[in-house]
From Swiss-Prot:
Keywords: Plasmid. InterPro entries: Transposase_IS66_Orf2 (IPR008878). Belongs to the transposase 34 family. This is Uncharacterized protein y4hO. NCBIfam families: IS66_TnpB. Pfam families: TnpB_IS66 (PF05717). It comes from Sinorhizobium fredii (strain NBRC 101917 / NGR234).
Amino acid sequence: MLPSGQNVRVWIATGHTDMRCGFPSLALRVQEVLKLNPLDGNLFVFRGRSGSLLKVIWSDGQGSCLFTKRLDRGRFVWPSAEGGAIAISPAQLSYLLSGIDWRHPQETWRPTKVG
């Protein structure tokens, strides 16, 4: 279960990340490359080169969590910037995890009647 609330920030680590990394390696990347504290309760999202796999790390003060999501088809929409972090809202994270373009979400038209 991912945390939600106004105090939680979601950071996308731009660029590609080696998806063989576990929590310690990803937390070290947050600390050294992004210059952020991986244990402050925020979510940090990483994407592999293929684009179909995401990893999210989060520390709640009692322990550390590593979440993984793989799309069966398609790719996760990812910012093109390199070597930094972009803050997004928890709602945008929900779009991202659903495979929806979180930068420009659009409501899908649904028919109201048949025929």
